[in-house]
UniProtKB/Swiss-Prot annotation:
Carbamoyl phosphate binds at S56, T57, R58, T59, R107, H134, P135, T136, Q137, C273, L274, R318. Reversibly catalyzes the transfer of the carbamoyl group from carbamoyl phosphate (CP) to the N(epsilon) atom of ornithine (ORN) to produce L-citrulline. It comes from the Bacteria. It comes from Clostridium botulinum (strain Hall / ATCC 3502 / NCTC 13319 / Type A). PROSITE patterns: CARBAMOYLTRANSFERASE. InterPro entries: Asp/Orn_carbamoyltranf_P-bd, Asp/Orn_carbamoylTrfase, Asp/Orn_carbamoylTrfase_sf, Asp_carbamoyltransf_Asp/Orn-bd, Orn/put_carbamltrans, OTCase_ArgI. This is Ornithine carbamoyltransferase.
Amino acid sequence: MFNLKNRNFLTLMDFTPKEINYFLDLARDLKRAKYTGTEVQRLKGKNIALIFEKASTRTRCAFEVGAKDQGAHVTYLGPTGSHIGKKESAADTARVLGRMYDGIEYRGFGQEIVETLAEYAGVPVWNGLTDEDHPTQILADFLTIREHFNKPLNEIKFAYVGDGANNMANALMIGAVKMGMDFRIVSPKEIPTDAALVAKCKEIAAETGAKVTITDNIEEGVKGCDVLYTDVWVSMGEPDSVWESKIKLLTPYRVDMNMIKMTGNPDAKFMHCLPAFHDEETAVGKEIKEKYGLSEMEVSHELFESKYSIVFDEAENRMHTIKAVMVATLGDQ
């Protein structure tokens, strides 16, 4: 039994492999309890603030449903509902909310903002996504891998394919080295992963038995992999020039049925944190088709809808793992 009461959840860098496994075991147990109607509420009477400087579907729903299941109350502060860094500093916001709430979730921009909230709030602070990291997503990913593979995480071969400089590449690499995985980032040289973070992760890998490979060679990068993972190539609000250059560089790295076959593993799975641009059924999808002539971006529609895809199991597990984080750090023991 681990006592994680009152701990912040800012990055998996702050947790040991045993503590990460504890979160995953707790999430598994909470999921089972929800399905069997035997869930015990450990957050009764708690008040939780959800700060969203960036819009969200999965993260917001996961925190709201998870909190409700556990008996907590939430207040949602959307992009127009909080004044962090505009009318009020992160430190002042933290000290105000910390007087009223038992826990605070933050989804937004720089990692330094969530770190400042944690420093000043006096209550547990949880990172729902920053520009540099996305630790709650990684717990969901690892729970999903556990459910689909009959082997421990330290025997998993995992390739993240696409934009090697984004927060998912960072977050997955941190989680993978903590858990002893064979982890590869397969990305064009022109989009490098943070060198200091790679160096730090390689240090951790030396202790845990993990492997870290950064390559632009798709065939080498995905060979023998259990999991191929990707994320969107560009974020909303980025200028057209960025879209054009990223699309040109990353189109060869689209994850498709051919790439799954390149793993040589008939049991390989495809994962994606969502939302995914895999068809023209959204306003963004239509815009991409009109501007760039692409009907799919980071993943082919065929693969997304195939038996290899476990993206909706992964999405559901956001809720169970986020619930586990709240219960472990805030719940009555």
